[in-house]
Swiss-Prot record:
Pathway the protein contributes to: Amino-acid biosynthesis; L-histidine biosynthesis; L-histidine from 5-phospho-alpha-D-ribose 1-diphosphate: step 1/9
Function: Required for the first step of histidine biosynthesis. May allow the feedback regulation of ATP phosphoribosyltransferase activity by histidine.
Keyword Amino-acid biosynthesis: yes
Highest rank taxon of the organism: Bacteria
Gene encoding the protein: hisZ
Location in or out of the cell: Cytoplasm
Gene Ontology biological-process entries: histidyl-tRNA aminoacylation; L-histidine biosynthetic process
Membrane-spanning ranges: none
Complexes and interactors: Heteromultimer composed of HisG and HisZ subunits.
Name of the protein in its database record: ATP phosphoribosyltransferase regulatory subunit
Example of a GO MF term: histidine-tRNA ligase activity
Gene source species: Burkholderia pseudomallei (strain 1106a)
Length: 382
């Protein structure tokens, strides 16, 4: 085997892509800060049981595991940063009021989520803790849409779902709850034959409701169909009311209701959402409410948030990757060094052409040059 080969679905990030990713990362973190979100940096590696307190079997299967050579305990390489941020809020910060946190860092998956997906993602996201009202859900959804617009993406569609619908059906029907994982997988995959098979022996009301969920997709008027087709349980009525309210608040994206879009259902407890753009089959960002995640760390708090993969966003974003730069000569000249230093302090990119390498670098758009005129160094267009 060649020593330069990387594992499947793992890739190096080359300069032009890395520059674009970093530009987007800075834009998003600056925007998060403008909303009042504080950044945290959880470790890449934790004890396995700490990483898997929520998320169900799906998260367990996605998590790399290894043995700690110091303690002998099993460690995990994080596959999702959300549980880690919940741990920080519940156990380390221990604040009583509203806490807004954001993060950015790599996550690793044992298997890719799509045919060409990377197993190493750069996850960035934001979370609100401490407020159970829909105001927090609305702010998080607005921040997610704001962030996606900052990356240059257009024609965004926001799909809304609610974990409370399925939870209410399971709470009423123990037989359905016992096969909850299989039902979740069938619903999430829109696998109608499998769904029909799993619901054949359930009660008539539960069977009809579960089989209706994949059909409850479309604009906000779908909620009227849902009220007609689903049992009039208080939890379901409240969930549909929440979705109607959230859908009405979205002004800068198309809104769709998809009551079978249950990505991450295992740890969500309320409104769930995912953002899609034309030409990309999978969601480019997703999130939702997960009020019970902190319970495993000793303190359950109302929480909602979202995350996205910056590497995937960079791949589809129209943001220009080549940065403007100033080309300067290489000379032993104190005045030149001072001019270059002043420009760099002002935030300019200044590339000094090393002797024998006077060509313009393809990675940068050197649209200006630092030249000597009458004993002074000045900038001129190239």
């Amino acid at each position: 085997m060649s020593t330069w080969l990387l594992p499947e679905n793992i890739a190096d990030v080359l300069p032009s892509e890395a520059r674009k990713i970093e530009e987007l990362r800075r834009r998003l973190l600056d925007r998060f800060r403008s909303y009042g979100y504080e950044m945290v940096m959880p470790p890449l590696l934790e004890y396995l049981e700490s990483l898997l307190t929520s998320g169900g079997n799906e998260l367990r299967l996605r998590t790399f595991k290894l043995v700690d050579q110091v303690s002998g305990r099993t460690l995990g390489l994080r596959a999702d940063m959300t549980p880690q941020v919940a741990r920080i809020d519940a156990h380390l910060l221990n604040r009583q009021g509203v806490t807004r946190l954001c993060y950015a860092g790599p996550v690793l998956h044992t298997r890719p989520r799509g045919l060409h997906a990377s197993r190493e993602q750069l996850q960035i996201g934001a979370e609100i803790y401490g407020h159970a009202g829909l105001e927090a859900d609305q702010e998080i959804q607005q921040l997610m849409l704001d962030a996606l617009h900052l990356t240059g993406l257009k024609k965004i569609r926001l799909d809304l779902c609610h974990a409370g619908v399925l939870a209410a059906l399971f709470a009423r029907d123990a037989a359905a709850a016992e096969r909850g994982e299989a039902l979740y997988e069938a619903l999430a995959g829109k696998d109608v034959p499998r769904l029909n098979e799993l619901t054949d022996d359930l009660g008539a009301d539960t069977r009809a409701a579960l089989r209706a969920l994949p059909r409850l997709y479309g604009d906000a008027s779908v909620l009227d169909d849902a009220r007609r087709l689903l049992p009039a349980l208080p939890e379901i009525t409240r969930a549909l009311d929440d979705l109607a309210h959230l859908a009405a608040q979205v002004k800068d994206a198309e809104v769709a209701i998809d009551l079978a879009d249950l990505r991450g259902y295992a740890y969500h407890s309320g409104a769930m959402f995912a953002a899609y753009v034309d030409g990309v089959p999978n969601a480019v960002a997703h999130g939702g409410r997960y009020d019970h995640v902190g319970q495993a760390y000793g303190r359950a708090r109302p929480a909602t948030g979202f995350s996205l993969d910056l590497r995937e966003i960079a791949r589809i974003s129209p943001v220009e990757a080549r940065g403007a730069a100033i080309l300067a000569p290489w000379k032993q000249d104190d005045a030149l060094r001072a001019a270059v230093g002043a420009l760099r302090d002002a935030g300019e990119v200044v590339i000094q052409a090393l002797p024998g390498h006077d060509h313009v670098l393809d990675e940068f758009a050197c649209d200006r040059a630092l030249v000597e005129r009458d004993g002074a160094w000045v900038i001129e267009p190239r």
